[in-house]
Amino acid sequence: VICVNRKDGSVAWNTEVHRQKPGPMRKQNSYATPTPVTDGKYVYSVFYDGTVAAVDFSGKIVWKNSEVKFFSLHGLGASPILVNGQVIMPFDGSSREENQVGWKIPWDKAIVLSLDAENGSVRWKGQRGESRVGHVTPILVDKGRQLVSAGGDRVQGFDPKTGKRIWSIYSQGEGVTPSPAVGDGLIYTSSGFEAPTLRAIRLGGKGDVTKTHIAWEQKRGVAALSSLLYVKPYLYSISRDNILHCIEASSGKIIWMERLSGVHWASPVYADGRIYILSEEGVTIVLRPGAKYDEVARNDIGDTCLASMAVSQGNFYIRSAQHLYCIGN
């Protein structure tokens, strides 16, 4: 874990937190892909093999938890979130012994893990049931009363206090990557591989709500890698063929489409009234949200970029393959 001075980019400290054995993964992945998260006291990181670690702001290791022995042919792609003193992380992996199990064939080993943020002990393990490989960072909805987490072929709502599964929707696919978005009282999810489907889900259900709580479904404009972005009243989605879709969030109607240059792994972000879309080639497109494609600017840092940018205090932080950039006025 590396601490960088946000003002000048100098390294304050660099702590070796964990060592792990090399294993299979996609070439675009790494052994430390999950984005760290902080509560202002500790910084929480998750690593390729499933180890979760906390360090304080001096770089001292506070605790480590290796409860989950994670494996996936893709590597690990989801990131942890913080909920009321808990570090919550989904682990939707596959079998070491049989490549098809968990990847192509559903199994019952996937979990959503909750750890106590103070000491790393297990609070609860939420069970998916039968599901497949996924790489989706969960979100909170319903004023924090529900945790929505998508696995390889399931989208599920959990009680963040207990880990009890409240509802579940079947969602054909595997290797699902985009995180859900929320707006207009709906949850938007995407399964971009195998049977690409974009869905809007209503809250309020219990049990299997596949037949009762899908508000609309769209087979076009399905996000495959980058996450969905909701900016009222539209949903923005980048499909596998790098076409940006603007979709009416309440109905699923496609408002406009625009083919983007380059490849897009990073998720679009919304800041200060603009949408920012970063390509693998290091080009950021700046758009005004709305009922037509309205490009404001285009900026090129000339570096390979796979990670989504962070926004803080008027600055953009971009992690490329070789550098960390701070972009500001």
What are these regions (language model features)?
Residues 1-329:
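Noncatalytic, solvent-exposed loop/strand surfaces
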